[in-house]
UniProtKB/Swiss-Prot annotation:
Protein name: 2-succinyl-5-enolpyruvyl-6-hydroxy-3-cyclohexene-1-carboxylate synthase
Native organism: Shewanella woodyi (strain ATCC 51908 / MS32)
Cofactor list: Mg(2+); Mn(2+); thiamine diphosphate
InterPro entries: MenaQ_synth_MenD (IPR004433), MenD_middle (IPR032264), THDP-binding (IPR029061), Thiamin_PyroP_enz_TPP-bd_dom (IPR012001), TPP_enzyme_TPP-bd (IPR011766)
Pfam families: TPP_enzyme_C (PF02775), TPP_enzyme_M_2 (PF16582), TPP_enzyme_N (PF02776)
Function: Catalyzes the thiamine diphosphate-dependent decarboxylation of 2-oxoglutarate and the subsequent addition of the resulting succinic semialdehyde-thiamine pyrophosphate anion to isochorismate to yield 2-succinyl-5-enolpyruvyl-6-hydroxy-3-cyclohexene-1-carboxylate (SEPHCHC).
Length: 569
């Protein structure tokens, strides 16, 4: 092939790739600038079916794509140039793999003759993500390779894919076509009708992998005292159906922070703190059967409860085959959606309403939180509860890792409304949280609140640049307790060790950071000013930062006081 046609063929392959991705359900493409990915960048610039998102930092870019994929429940493409640019996506790819989010990484790469020979910005990119992504390594574009071979390779890899895919795209120079004089009509003629439709070249049916219990199995299972536990569930999976199932069986529904039901009045949302209480735990230990729907529970006390109880029958329901049982206690695992499992003809339990007292205890716990948190000193738990109380079904809440998500799990209020709730609890890292929340906010433009700790925000400071481009309300609430104060809750043997090696007090505040990116900022130290700032921010068409300044020990001391009261009650 003539050398001057190389750039045009590179662009053609990039165009074919992105066109097929759009036909396979990709709605968003996230791109970082770089030269070796130029064929993909130029193709994206001409592609009207994909919404473009650009950012200079590949680590934040990957997490933004993760948030977009979580919110859209569809695959999202990420384009980077060669070298360490690809490696910067690794944290987001790991999180996506562990939580079954379909990211598609398209990495520009040097051709084979420039690998492992000292060429600039050239590393060995195939399989860079190891077991955390399915791998496709494309050769350099070549007219000897029929275009349908490229399309069918993509179709097989992406159709029904629920985890990351890495497509490594090798390109020879020149990368920038000076003209578009090449005629590829003959080359594309083998595609037939594909050029005149909007369908993928190969269309795969949905695999039916569901496994459901028989009527006899369900009748045996519900014979006795049981509980239902709702783990991590996505907002679109009809979690309300679990409330109806709980009522039908007459078993209590214990809900995780990530279940979309933590604040529902018809469930036992305060389960983490109830397991502190001797009489509540004694009642719960009477349960003989458990139905766990979803995995990745947040509460260690709830995980320990599952491990410690002597279950006669332990069923787990997951959307696909995977291991999400760290106590290794489940005996029967069903592969089904929430809709499929709840729409079965379940019989009423022989021990229906055996634990009605739990509802009373759950309500008593809420009254305790109102007294000990809402009417006490200003602090992190008070802010988390205030945010949760104000949420509507049209809003979204992204809860950061470390202390914020635990405060929500422990103390979230009982409310009549709850918006969609998002977390990054696969690897549970504190990186990329702001970028992920930006992605969630950008998909449909719903008002979104992020609750994030100060160390997490320092990790992702660059992503304020992404936030500055948000056109819908994005409220970034930074709980600044001057360091990693979750370590106050852990048994570090010496206070100086805790301070010097774990907590790492920094003394930073975020006003200048917000100003650098042109984002409105408020600093608050009491509830009235927080609520006023929050209401302004949730109605502002763009990102806002509210920094909550609290003493280092405030949250941990309050948690300890409440735990002591509960244990004695």
């Amino acid at each position: 092939m003539q050398i001057e046609k190389t750039a045009e063929l590179n662009l053609l392959w990039g165009t074919l790739i992105l066109e097929e991705l759009s036909r396979l359900g990709v709605q968003h493409i996230c791109m970082a600038p770089g030269s070796r990915s130029t064929p993909l960048t130029l193709a994206a610039a001409k592609q009207s079916k994909l919404k473009q998102h650009l950012h200079f930092d590949e680590r934040g870019l990957g997490f933004m794509a993760l948030g977009l994929a979580k919110a859209s429940q569809a695959p999202v493409a990420v384009v980077t140039t060669s070298g360490t640019a690809v490696a910067n996506l690794y944290p987001a790819v790991i999180e996506a793999w562990l939580t079954h989010v379909p990211l598609i990484v398209l990495s520009g790469d040097r051709p084979p003759e420039l690998i492992d020979c000292g060429a600039n910005q050239a590393i060995i990119q195939p399989a860079i993500f190891a077991q955390y992504a399915k791998q496709i390594n494309l050769s350099t574009p070549d007219l000897a390779i029929r275009p349908e071979a490229l399309l069918t390779l993509l179709d097989e890899a992406i159709s029904n894919q629920s985890q990351p895919l890495h497509i490594n795209c090798m390109y020879r120079e020149p990368l920038y076509p000076s003209t578009m004089s090449a005629n590829f009509t003959q080359y594309l003629s083998t595609l037939g009708n594909w050029q005149h439709t909007n369908h993928a070249y190969n269309q795969y049916g949905k695999p039916n992998l569901s496994s459901l219990p028989s009527s006899d199995a369900m009748a045996r299972f519900v014979h006795g005292k049981g509980v239902i536990i709702a783990g991590t569930l996505t907002p679109d999976c009809d979690p309300q159906a679990l409330v109806a199932l709980s009522q039908k069986l007459g078993w209590p529904l214990l809900t995780d922070a990530q279940s979309q039901l933590r604040q529902h009045p018809g469930v036992i949302g305060n389960i983490d703190q109830l397991l502190h209480q001797p009489k509540a735990k004694a009642l719960l230990m009477q349960a003989e059967r458990v139905l766990v729907i979803g995995g990745r529970l947040l509460s260690k006390r709830l995980i320990d409860y599952l491990a410690q109880n002597k279950w006669k029958s332990y069923w787990q329901v997951l959307p696909r085959q995977m291991r999400l049982d760290p106590s290794h206690s489940a005996k029967q695992i069903w592969h089904a959606s929430v809709t499929n499992i709840t729409s079965l003809s379940w019989p009423r339990s022989s021990e229906a309403n055996w634990a009605l007292q739990l509802t009373q205890q759950n309500d008593e716990m809420e009254r305790l939180f109102e007294q000990q948190i809402d009417n006490a000193e200003f602090g992190e738990a008070m802010v988390v509860r205030a945010i949760a109380k104000s949420q509507t079904k049209q809003q979204q809440l992204f809860i950061g890792n470390s202390l914020p998500v635990r405060l929500y799990d422990m103390f979230a209020p009982i409310t009549t409304e709850q918006g969609a709730t998002f977390t990054n609890r696969g690897a549970s890292g504190i990186d990329g949280l702001l970028a992920s929340a930006c992605g969630v906010a950008m998909h449909q433009g719903r008002a979104t609140t992020l609750i994030i700790g100060d160390i997490s925000q320092l990790h992702d400071l660059n992503s304020l640049a992404i936030a500055s481009h948000c056109s819908s309300p994005l409220v970034i609430v930074i709980l600044n307790n001057d360091g990693g104060n979750i370590f106050n809750l852990l048994p570090v043997p010496d206070e100086k060790l805790r301070s010097d090696y774990y907590r790492l007090a920094h003394g930073f505040e975020f006003g200048y950071g917000a100003a650098m990116f042109g984002i409105p900022y408020n600093r608050v130290e009491e509830l009235e000013s927080f609520e006023e700032s929050y209401q302004d921010a949730i109605h502002y068409e763009g990102a806002s930062v509210i920094e909550v300044i609290v003493p280092q020990q405030q949250a941990s001391d309050q948690i300890a006081r409440i735990a002591s009261w509960i244990k004695q009650s």
